[in-house]
Amino acid sequence: MHLPDGWRKGMGALALLALGLWYLFSLPNPLFEAPYSYVLEDRRGQLLGARVAEDGQWRFPPPDSLPHRFTTCLLAFEDRRFWRHPGFDPLALGRAALQNLRAGRVVSGGSTLTMQVIRLSRKPRSRSFWQKLYEIVLATRLELSRSKEEILRLYAGHAPFGGNVVGLEAASWRYFGKPPQLLSWAEAATLAVLPNQPGLIHPGRNRRLLLQKRNRLLRRLLRDHQLDSTSFRLALEEPLPSRPHPLPRLAPHLLERFAQSVTRQRRFRSTLDGNLQQAALELAERHERRLKANQIHNLAFVVLDLSSGEVLAYVGNAPHAGDEHQGWVDVVRAPRSSGSILKPFLFARALDAGLILPPSLLPDVPSDLSGFHPENFHESFDGAVPAERALIRSLNVPFVHLLRDYGLERFHRDLKRLGFASLRFPARHYGLTLVLGGGEVTLWELAGAYGHLGRELLRYHEAPQDFRPGPLLAPRVLLSPSGESENDETRSTLPPVISPAAAWQTLKTLEKLERPDEARHWELFPSSRKISWKTGTSFGFRDAWA
C-alpha cells in the first residue's frame, strides 16, 4: 500500500513526537524507591544512631555533600571523564568492547557513573546489549535533569558495599567507625573500589585482591599528582578493616521516638550535644551498676539548656536494662506517679496568689479531709511549720492543706497550662492527692515545667526593666534544616503561670534542700555551685524523681 508523502511525513513527525515525549518522561520519579534507614545526628551532625531500613539494609539517606578524598578516588577508579561526558563515554565503551572480545566473555562494561546510577535504580536485570543501550539513553536524560554533583551523591548513596551495607555513609561507619569526612586516603580508596566487587570485604574472601585494587588506585593517584609521596607511603601501610564496626547507639529511645512519630523524613538533626550525650550515657551506666544492687533496673534523665529550652542530653532508659526489664521503654515519655515533685509549683502559685509568704505557718497536724487522712513520710507531725520549711522537708500534710485553700480545680488548671498533658482526667478524679502523687506525669513534662521556672528567672535577670513574660516552651529536641530548633510540642500562648518573683523565691528555697550521699557537705567548698533541686517518691516506692 502506497501512502502519500504528506501521510508519511505526518506519521514520522508523530513518531518523533512520541519518542520525544517518552524520552522526556523516561526517568522514574522518584528515581530510587528503596527505603532508607532512620538516622539521628547531634546538633553538629555527629552520628548518634541509626535504624536499619525496612528491607534489612543499612542505607542512609543520600548525603548533602561528598568528601574530596572519596570523590577523587571514585572518579580516578570508575569514571575519569565524568565531568566531560554527557552520561556515556564512547571511549570507555569502545575499550570495554575490545577487552570483552579478547577475553571471549564480559570482563568490562564501560559504564559511566551516570549509567551505574541508572542500573542501581532498577531491579536487577540481565546484562545485554539492549539493556546497556537503555541505560545509555536514560543516563543522558539523567544528565539533563540533574547536576554532576547530584549524580555523584546519588551514586554514593546507593552503591553496594558488601553484605547489607549500601551507600558511602553507612559503609564508612560500618567498616571504619567514622564519618566519610574523616576517611584517610587509604580508607577512601578502599570504599571507592569496593562497589566494583562488594563481596571482597568479607573475611575469608579474596581480600588480597581488594588490597591490590586499593593500592593500584593509590599509585594512579600518585602518578596523576593527586596524592603526594608521603601520603602515598602512609596509605600503603594502612590495613584493610578486619570486621564491621557497630553503629553508635547513643540515643536509641529518641531515635525510635522520631521514627514512630515523624515519617516524612529519615535523617534527624537533633539539639543534642554528642559529647554531653556520651557523658550522660557513661553517668547512667555508673548509676545503673549501683542501683542494680537494690533491684532497680530502669532510669532516665534529660538535660536542658535553660535559655533556649533545647535538650542537650536524652537518656530514655538504663543502657543495659535489656528485654527482661523492658529496656525498650522510653521512660522519659512514660507517665508515672508524680510523688511530691509537683509541690514547688503549688508553692509558687500560692506565693503569686498572696496566699502565703515563705515564713507563713501551715498546719501539720492529724487531719480528716472528707475521709482523706494525709500523713508525712516520717509518720509524725510538727503542729505548725513555715511554708518554706514544709517545701524543704517535703511535708505532705501542710501541702494538702495548702492545696485545699488554693483550690484543687485552680491548681489542676495551672498544671495543665504548665504542660502536664498527662493529667487527662478532671481535677475531682485526683482529689487532694494530686500534690502527693495521685496523678501521673512524664519526665519530659517535668523537665519543661522546671525549665520554665529557671528560664523566666534568667530572662528577668538579663533585662529586668524591659522584661515581658515569655510563652511556655516545651523542651525542644529537633533542629530544622536551617539549624533552628523546632518545638515538637504545642507552645502555650497564655499568660505565664508563675511570675519571676515567685520563681525566684521557689528556686531559692529549693537551694536549701540537703544533698544526698557524698555531696552532703558541698557548702564547705568555695568552688561549689548552688543548685535548686527537688525529689519525689511515687506511691508504693515505685519511682524516685529528682
Model feature map: region roles:
Residues 1-293, 306, 310-312, 317, ...:
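Juxtamembrane regions of bacterial inner-membrane/periplasmic proteins
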Residues 54-57, 134-138, 175, 197-203, ...:
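Flexible glycine/proline-enriched surface loops and loop-helix/loop-strand junctions
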Residues 73-75, 221, 280, 309, ...:
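Active-site SXXK
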Residues 83-92, 166-169, 228-232, 325-328, ...:
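Short, well-structured active-site flanking segments
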Residues 102-127, 181, 244-260, 307, ...:
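Conserved catalytic neighborhood of penicillin-recognizing serine enzymes
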Residues 119, 123, 157-164, 181, ...:
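Glycine-rich, acidic and aromatic/proline-enriched surface loops and short helix-turn segments
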Residues 373-376, 407-448, 466, 471-472:
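Mid-domain, small-residue-enriched loop/turn segments at the edges of structured enzyme/sensor domains
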